[in-house]
Structure formats: structure tokens, C-alpha cells
Amino acid sequence: MVYSTKLGEIEITDDQIFVFEEGIPGFEHLKKFALIFPEETFPIGWLLSLEDSHVGLPVVDPKLVRPDYDPVVPSEDLEKLGVSNQDELLFFCVLTIPPGKPEEATINLRAPIIIRQNTKKGMQVILENADYHLKHLLSEEMERAKSMV
């Protein structure tokens, strides 16, 4: 199906659509999202609302930015998605990219988007790990990742 999104008219398939029963913080009223990875922005993907064409969040696999990223999802959140083991989940972190200042981009490692692919459900969780913050400077994290290789 073709949807109007923040990125324009986009063909979206059923396997790209996920339901966030609780919405996501700041957008609790929005429940239906698509996760896409356009060639022109890869490895950055987009979590796009299918209910409000103005809402779209840039996301990335946190392991690309912080190879030692090791989140522990609270058990109550695992229960909400119907899993007992977080290995069944996909993790994405939201990027904030100030207009005209990509060098000031940050990644939110504290509140990842988690997705259970086989049930098409997702949610944003708040981790208790004090090492992860809402705003990590992306350039610093990328330098740190290079030094780990």
C-alpha cells in the first residue's frame, strides 16, 4: 500500500508495519508505524507513523554505534510483548539530528524502540542502566566504536 509519510508517498508492505499498543512517548495517540530503511539513508532507518504523516523518527541499530550495547529490558515490558527472552526482540535507537548541524546529532541509548517481529508489536522502553543516557553525542560514540575494533 502507498502511505503519505514524513518522507512523502511511500510504498509500505505489511511486513514493515508494527503496532505500538501504548504509542511512544510524546505520541501516545499514534499506534501504527512502519519501519523502513531507504537506500539513501541506510543504515539510518525511519519509524514512520501511518496515522500522522508529520511524524517520523530516524532510528539506527545501536550495535552499529556502540558495539558493546547490552540493554536489559525490564521484565514487565517483556511481558507486554509476550516474550520471556529479549533475544527475540529487535532493538533500534532514536537519533536527534539538529537541522543544518549533523555534527551535533545524538542517539538515545536509554530508551530504545524494541520490536517483536513475529507478532508485529513494538514499544519504546526506558532502561534502568545508568550508563545509557537520552543524549549521547553520535560522533563521540562512533569514535569510541572505532577504538573497540
Curated annotation (Swiss-Prot):
For the keyword Cell division, the answer is no
Pfam families associated with the record: FliW
Keywords on record? Bacterial flagellum biogenesis, Chaperone, Cytoplasm, Translation regulation
Task: Identify one Gene Ontology CC term for this UniProt entry.
Answer: cytoplasm
**Primary localization class, coarse:** cytoplasm
Per the record, the similarity remark reads:
Belongs to the FliW family.
Under the subunit heading, UniProt states: Interacts with translational regulator CsrA and flagellin(s).
Record's protein name: Flagellar assembly factor FliW
Species: Thermotoga neapolitana (strain ATCC 49049 / DSM 4359 / NBRC 107923 / NS-E)
